[in-house]
Amino acid sequence: MRWKYAAWILIAVVDVMCCSSEEKSASVSFVTRPGSQVIAFPFIFVGHSIVVLPTTKYSNLKRNAKSMEDLTFLLSNLSHVVWSLTIDSTVYKDGGRLEKLFDKRMRGYLDGVSLDVLRMYVNGSKTFSELLQIVYERTFECDSRRSRQMARYGESLIREIDNMIESMPAEMSEEEKEKMRSDLNNNRKYVESFHDTEKWRQVVEAEKMVCNTCKEICLGLKEEELMGLLAEGSAKKYIKASAGESEVSSTVYPEYIVVDISLLLDAHREHGGDVTKELVKQMLLGKKEEEIDKRYIGKVANAVKERRRRGEKEIEKRVKKLLRDEEKAKSKKRGKRKSVGVSEAKEEEKKESETEEVEAGEEVEMPSEEVGGARRKTGKKSEGGRKRYKIHRRVLRWRKSPEKIKEEWDKGSEERWRGKSLEEIREQKVFHDIMGVLELLRSPDADRFFMDTGDYTKGGSERQRMVAIGVLESGGKRMLGVVEVGTFKDCPSGCPVVYHLMFRVTGIEGMGDVMRRGGGNLGEASDVEKIDEDKEYQDAGKFVYPKGVTFETVKETGSFQIVWGNPSNTSEVLRRLTIQCRPCVI
């Protein structure tokens, strides 16, 4: 095992652009095992936010002036970033002779590669995923018929290292000379691999596979599903763990993973694209190198196989149901009474329904509920009972009419709500009047939907914040975002009190700030400085909507829906909030 250091030159320059005129330097360190290599994901972050996806074209970037400013340096030096991630920096970043040799023999070549691919990106229609693959191909030149620049640079490095071994300073002690000799010999051995075209061909092949898979994932998922996938991994990023908060917040960087590339390539050849896609998803979710071995790959392959089997079975059931419905329609059209064939079909439908109920028992299900002045309790409590929450009056207030809400806010202590117009309150009621979320929050499997972003202290109270990815449909608009739940513990009972509940509209780009502990700037903007702990809480289990208000909660395999209907016309949907299930971690 050896330490490798990625020289993050992009950090220094972005700090100059965004922070001050004083240049700063930073580096990220990581450990690689024999056979392991750093592979870059085709995602670019600015601070905690994703600004470039595998599918992003240059024309997409031009719409966001700030992103263009932040990305200018990285895109102009993409080959340097790839080199820094891939090559052990101890062989070219010693602050002396080896670094000068890199400047003389390699820097100009990498500059040329970067400028060429940037020109290609600006003037063409390639995605960032395709661009990154081209950078790898041109940097390592594995298919070149000419002498590779990397190999020529390696020859110069070996000669320089040999000279350094032979001409050690006389004033050094024998112990110091021995250590220096050992380090230089290790570097020499590593540099010899620059001639190993097959090794670097594998690196390029693995990078291409990961880039193409990431692009497939982005194209194959709904935006909210992709947002959920990236949100889960946002707290597990390598660079976030290696660098400080202030350093990360002003940095442009690509995400990467350390992985055994031979293992990854073998898995792709043996199991195919579906298993590779799931493996890459798990890496994006935060699966680390030491967790990925042959046994784990087999586990992923079995999970993919089982998912495929269930999907095929579900399709088969739907086809049978369509055939039965078609047969019923024909029978009605002919005006016949129930025939033997229809009875048999009914019996078959009943049997299949019973089978479905048994199979559904494998997953946690929650019954639908309709609320219209009274709660209809159905289903059994899970072992240990449902989770208990209390509701703060500032959350309960949103169930009232806009006029009543305005009256109470104007008399209240929260300045940010005082003086709001009725129109503003009506707009905000759409995002805050989502009490049906408590049905999910209290359920035994709430953790399958909500992510805990951590505890933090504000206004003298310790608080917890949870978020879930969702889609809110209202007034003909479909809005992507997160459901935010803020709680604190009631004293002395210790029962969590929900004091903040809302749907926040945000896209993939702004998701990083939303996911930060304490909510980052976005969370702080909506958070209450000091909570009015007046004990006027209501037990969530006893909450009942006012008469005339109707909503239904529907729990499905991958989502939870709250549907608000028109009391005068139940077929008319006024609003629908769909909360996505968190992606499965294998």
UniProtKB/Swiss-Prot annotation:
Region (Disordered): 326-386
Top-rank lineage group of the source organism: Eukaryota
One Pfam family of this chain: DUF3654
Compositional bias of kind Basic residues: 330-339
TM segment ranges: none
Biased composition (Basic and acidic residues): 344-353
Family annotation (InterPro entries): DUF3654 (IPR022115), UPF0329 (IPR011667)
Biased composition (Acidic residues): 354-368
Family listed: Belongs to the UPF0329 family.
Name of this protein: UPF0329 protein ECU04_1670
Organism: Encephalitozoon cuniculi (strain GB-M1) (Microsporidian parasite)
